[in-house]
């Protein structure tokens, strides 16, 4: 009996080791020079389009960054969020966390069109999302990084998964945030650093109404200023947008964390990062050192880009980001 139990434990260990090796192998296939021979002009081509779009509308930088996040947290960084509905599946665009909220699809289409003309059938939509996220941060004054590439695109999307709570709602508690990020291999420090993306961008009234009218851990003058464009009545001004960082809304810096220390986080999921909990010290450190924030944000973005990529012969290189081949 004891011998059988030992054999069973060894078998379970071998299976676990195999799974870990498969995950490591997939990540190992991602590399920064993946397209250096097959599409050498990829990076400057993407940069030019993102630069043009950010020049037209600064807000689009935050939208492109968020698009990558919402893709990676639903079955991995596989560009499933870009797929339109088909007869065989309902896509993720109209799921609760994305509907009337996630933007930037047309920018990805424009980039894909240009890249296809240069290097047909070579570059995945998933990799384009990763590059545009990096370029958006850079163009708003943040620190860049070398993007690991080699992802392939999914051939399906999942409305139900996108709606299942894997994407943190704006009313999240700290425990909920920690658990959701941990499920994707991201630490509490990674979570706080990635939340710093809210140093740019805007949120709709419907996502922060409860906070500005009902919260007690909020600066009163801040709450009053936000109420001017966000009426208390549900259905009134739901889509009115407010900037997330009052101080430097168009600069990727550490101001977001200074706002949290002063109880001026716009979303509940922002302020819970500094509310007497386990992440308070991280917020304080970022509020005092933008370089510490930049360092950890870059590391967390690279880790997020490693979430369950399709590599090798898995998935496909879509000709259009909106539909499978």
Curated annotation (Swiss-Prot):
The keyword Signal applies. The modification Pyrrolidone carboxylic acid is found at residue 29. Residues 1-28 form the signal peptide. Glycans are attached at residues 99, 214. SUPFAM superfamilies: Heme-dependent peroxidases. Pfam families: peroxidase. GO terms for cellular component: extracellular region. The active site is at 70 (proton acceptor). Heme b binds at residue 198. The keyword Metal-binding applies. Ca(2+) 1 binds at residues 71, 74, 76, 78, 80. Keywords: Calcium, Disulfide bond, Glycoprotein, Heme, Hydrogen peroxide, Iron, Metal-binding, Oxidoreductase, Peroxidase, Pyrrolidone carboxylic acid, Secreted, Signal. GO terms for biological process: hydrogen peroxide catabolic process; response to oxidative stress. Its main location: secreted. Substrate binds at residue 168. It catalyses: 2 a phenolic donor + H2O2 = 2 a phenolic radical donor + 2 H2O. It is found in: Secreted. It comes from the Eukaryota. Disulfide bonds join 39-119, 72-77, 125-321, 205-230. One of its GO terms (molecular function) is lactoperoxidase activity. The record marks 66 as: Transition state stabilizer. There are 73 peroxidase genes in A.thaliana. Removal of H(2)O(2), oxidation of toxic reductants, biosynthesis and degradation of lignin, suberization, auxin catabolism, response to environmental stresses such as wounding, pathogen attack and oxidative stress. These functions might be dependent on each isozyme/isoform in each plant tissue. This is Peroxidase 68. The gene is PER68.
């Amino acid at each position: 009996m004891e011998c059988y139990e030992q054999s069973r434990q060894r078998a379970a260990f071998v299976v676990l080791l195999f799974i870990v090796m498969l995950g490591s192998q997939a990540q190992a296939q991602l590399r920064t020079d993946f397209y250096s021979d097959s599409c050498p002009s990829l990076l400057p081509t993407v940069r030019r389009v993102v630069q043009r779009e950010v020049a037209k509308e600064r807000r689009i930088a935050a939208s492109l960054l968020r698009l990558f996040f919402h893709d990676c947290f639903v079955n991995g960084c596989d560009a499933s969020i870009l797929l339109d509905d088909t007869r065989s599946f309902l896509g993720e665009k109209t799921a609760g966390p994305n509907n009337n909220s996630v933007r930037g699809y047309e920018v990805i289409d424009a980039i894909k069109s240009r890249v296809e003309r240069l290097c047909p059938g070579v570059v995945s939509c998933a990799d384009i999302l990763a590059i545009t996220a990096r370029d958006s941060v850079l163009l708003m004054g943040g620190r860049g990084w070398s993007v690991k590439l080699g992802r392939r695109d999914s051939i399906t999307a999942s409305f139900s998964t996108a709606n299942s709570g894997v994407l943190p709602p704006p009313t999240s508690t700290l425990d909920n945030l920690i658990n959701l990020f941990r499920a994707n291999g991201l630490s509490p420090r990674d979570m706080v650093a990635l939340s710093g993306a809210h140093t740019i961008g805007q949120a709709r009234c419907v996502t922060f109404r409860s906070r500005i009218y009902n919260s007690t851990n909020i600066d009163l003058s801040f709450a009053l200023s936000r109420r001017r464009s966000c009426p208390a009545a549900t259905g009134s001004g739901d889509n009115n947008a407010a900037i997330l960082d009052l101080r430097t809304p168009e600069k990727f810096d550490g101001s977001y964390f200074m706002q949290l220390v002063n109880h001026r986080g716009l979303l509940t999921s922002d302020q819970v990062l500094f509310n007497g909990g386990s992440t308070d010290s991280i917020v304080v450190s970022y509020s005092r050192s933008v370089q510490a924030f930049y360092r950890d944000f870059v590391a967390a973005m690279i880790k997020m880009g490693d979430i369950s990529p399709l590599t090798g012969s898995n998935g496909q290189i879509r000709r259009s980001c909106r539909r499978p081949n």
